Amino acid sequence: QYLTEHGYEVWGVDLAETAIKWAEERFQQANLTAHFIVGDVCNLPQFSDLEFDLIVDGSCLHCLIGEARQRCLAEVKRVLKPKGHFAISSMCVSPHNPEDIDCYDIEKHQLLKNGQPWRTLRPLQALLDEVREAQFSVRATKINNNPWWDHATLVCSAL
């Protein structure tokens, strides 16, 4: 909402129709206008190359498993303008909660639910390396330590 309130055109993408409806309702209640679409962050054909000045990952990257992460980062790079910025909000580091520790695949850095990969929790350095390998420069990093797992905020720009 902050960006819309300050005059920016805002787009939101989520796989879940429920999340899109929730965002639309929040913006409508605040009397703000934005564009929300059900879509896949790993495949954004509705957007042109070099279209956005800023892309904000609202805690999405850690929800992606395996190669989907690289596809997402490649799409972000494709639609981000030169000198544009990419803000990432992602769970990182191994879990702290004993229940989650028992369900954490330390080799793949994945939190499992019912035996299936559910979230990716990479160590901070591995997350930074992954983002750099996708041709982003990391400009700033902030870690919030939480009782269940740590959360990284990265500000990046495309190389």
What are these regions (language model features)?
Residues Q1-Q46, L64, A68-R71, E75, ...:
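Class I (Rossmann-like) S-adenosyl-L-methionine-dependent methyltransferase catalytic domain
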Residues V56:
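A conserved beta-strand element that flanks and buttresses the S-adenosyl-L-methionine
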Residues S59-C63:
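Short catalytic micro-motifs in class I SAM-dependent methyltransferases
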